[in-house]
Amino acid sequence: MARVKRAVNAHKKRRTVLERAKGYRGQRSRLYRKAKEQLLHSFNYNYRDRKARKGDFRKLWIQRINIAVRNEGITYNRFIQGLRLAGIELDRRALAELAVNDPDTFKTIVEQAKAALPEDVNAPVNA
């Protein structure tokens, strides 16, 4: 069997790992073994945080909407209930954007949601 010389491939592999680890602190950017291990962790963190980012943004939108509707004298869950009853199908992202950048339009949406709510808080919604 012929001998396989891997020097070129090995150097290329190590160089790419060290290039990807550029910017890490200490040995993690200079030593191949440490850099490789850190890259594996980094890929896992990256994957996990890409999933978590979606929930983080949803929480942020809910907080922004909650602050804006409380200034109008209604709670967040009553506002969402009013939107459903009024047939307004705006997602939380759009509502948060309106609350921050266009308060007048958001105020009219809140008024429509308030109008759609039943007067009695404990009244059944379907009645």
From Swiss-Prot:
| UniProt cross-references to PROSITE patterns, sorted A to Z | RIBOSOMAL_L20
Q: Which GO terms describe its molecular function?
A: rRNA binding; structural constituent of ribosome
> What's the superkingdom here?
Bacteria
Q: Which residues form the signal peptide?
A: none
Stretches of the chain forming a coiled coil according to its record: none
Keyword field: Ribonucleoprotein, Ribosomal protein, RNA-binding, rRNA-binding
CC per GO annotation = ribonucleoprotein complex; ribosome
- Which InterPro entries has this protein been placed in? Ribosomal_bL20, RIBOSOMAL_L20_CS, Ribosomal_protein_bL20_C
Q: Name one GO biological process term.
A: translation
Q: Which SUPFAM superfamilies match?
A: Ribosomal protein L20
Matches recorded under CDD domains = Ribosomal_L20
- What family does this belong to? Belongs to the bacterial ribosomal protein bL20 family.
Role description: Binds directly to 23S ribosomal RNA and is necessary for the in vitro assembly process of the 50S ribosomal subunit. It is not involved in the protein synthesizing functions of that subunit.
| Name of this protein | Large ribosomal subunit protein bL20
Give the organism, scientific name: Bifidobacterium animalis subsp. lactis (strain AD011)
